[in-house]
A protein has these predicted regions:
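Residue-level detector of functional hotspots within protein domains
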Residues: 54-57, 61, 91, 100, ...
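Generic structural hydrophobic/aromatic packing signal, biased to beta-strands
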Residues: 35, 63, 101, 114-116, ...
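Extracellular/periplasmic catalytic domains that process cell-envelope and extracellular macromolecules
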Residues: 28-30, 64-65, 106-109, 128-130, ...
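Short secondary-structure boundary/capping segments
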Residues: 9-11, 53, 98, 128-136
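Aromatic-lined carbohydrate-binding/catalytic grooves of carbohydrate-active enzymes
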Residues: 1-87
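Generic recognition of stable, solvent-exposed alpha-helical segments in well-folded globular domains
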Residues: 19, 23, 58, 93-96, ...
Length: 173
């Protein structure tokens, strides 16, 4: 859905296949469906599309104007990209990019479900609700094996239930 470059004003540009995201959102909502989108706090997403780095407010405003209901915000693409982070081993360096986007999302009149994806690093279940995220990935990616499903879906989740509550959930992938 995303173009290779942003618009001259810095807002997200769409590609020729998805020329009107607001109309798409309206179409989905008219049918009782929700509208979700994917981005990253980095320069690029996992798929090498544009991330939200240094455009968080513009992107939050754009998501609101399109009628977005769900944002998956994926660490992939962020990594070591932001020059203001002094130490990657501090929990604060993992919280900062998510808290920054969350503040901009909460300024919007639309309620956007905020899903953090950073693969359980720095025990996100301990701070995800603190930054008012709705869900957070607790593990790495699942694979198409019973062993992976069992490990991620059951073994690694058993002690995390205390961190889930209404409006805030563990996401085992």
């Amino acid at each position: 859905w995303e173009a290779a470059k942003r618009n001259p004003d810095g807002t997200i540009a769409v590609n020729e296949k998805f020329t009107d995201m607001k109309a798409l959102g309206d179409w989905l909502h008219e049918r009782g469906l929700k509208f979700g989108i994917y981005s990253s706090p980095g320069n690029l997403t996992c798929g090498r599309y544009l991330g939200s780095l240094d455009h968080e407010l513009q992107d939050a405003e754009t998501y609101n104007s399109w009628g977005i209901d769900y944002l998956k915000y994926d660490w992939c693409g962020y990594g070591k990209k932001h020059p203001s982070e002094p130490d990657r081993n501090l929990v604060s360096s993992y919280i900062r990019p998510y808290l920054f986007m969350q503040r901009h999302l909460r300024q919007q009149p639309r309620d956007i479900f905020y899903s953090l994806c950073q693969y359980g690093m720095m025990n996100v279940w301990e701070w995800g609700a603190f930054i008012d995220a709705n869900s957070w990935r607790t593990t790495g990616d699942i694979t198409d094996t019973w062993k992976s499903l069992y490990s991620i879906g059951f073994e690694k989740q058993v002690d995390l239930y205390p961190y889930s509550k209404p409006g805030h959930w563990n996401d085992p992938d």
